[in-house]
Regions:
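Short, flexible, glycine/charge-rich loop motifs used to bind or transfer phosphoryl groups or to couple energy/partner
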Residues: 17-19, 46, 84-88
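Short consensus segments that form the blades of beta-propeller domains
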Residues: 44-50
Length: 178
């Protein structure tokens, strides 16, 4: 059982109130956060029925949002309502960008959703562009190509306060710390 800390690290993050109209987007980036406890032993949860989607990040030029769905710490969107909205996005004919598309699209299919439009997988594209890179993580690619990285200091601070592993047990945190 996870003990809720008396004092939580501050966070300025707020969930988006709505998803903007994206029908004119030429490309949409999508990233799933998952709880996948058996991935190392029995394979991805989307194939084995073990685990679930914890949250979905969506980004287009000029807007980005993270939609928490199953964080044990609360602050979640209604899954059924969000799924209907996500289906509309996935039905758009524009390019969809994923990092490790096989994994994320597998989870979306397990949810009964289909991705329409071209799928671009940065995890596959990166070694084709530069086979001699040391790392192909999304953070490493963002740093090298966009001069941007994500700060995980808030995640690690919150995980320490909650007494959990920041990566393996991220789903136990309230959404604002992810």
């Amino acid at each position: 059982m996870t003990q809720i800390p008396l004092f939580q690290p501050p966070s300025e993050w707020l969930p988006p109130e709505t998803i903007p109209a994206l029908q004119n987007a030429s490309q949409i980036a999508i990233d799933l956060e998952t709880y996948d406890p058996g991935i190392k032993d029995i394979g991805p949860g989307w194939a084995t029925g073990n685990g679930r989607i914890i949250g979905v990040a969506i980004a287009v030029d000029g807007w980005q949002g993270y939609f928490p769905l199953h964080h044990q710490g609360g602050g979640n969107f209604d899954e059924k309502i969000f799924k209907r909205q996500l289906k509309k996005i996935l039905d758009l004919p524009c390019d969809k960008i994923f990092h490790n598309a096989t994994y994320d699209v597998g989870w979306l299919k397990q949810w009964g959703l289909e991705v329409k439009g071209r799928i671009i997988d940065t995890m596959i594209a990166a070694p084709l562009i530069d086979e001699n890179r040391f790392r192909y993580s999304l953070n490493a690619l963002g740093k090298d190509y966009l001069q941007e990285t994500k700060s995980e200091s808030g995640l690690y601070e919150a995980a320490k306060a909650w007494g959990i592993d920041p990566k393996a047990e991220m789903y136990k945190l309230p959404a604002q710390h992810v």
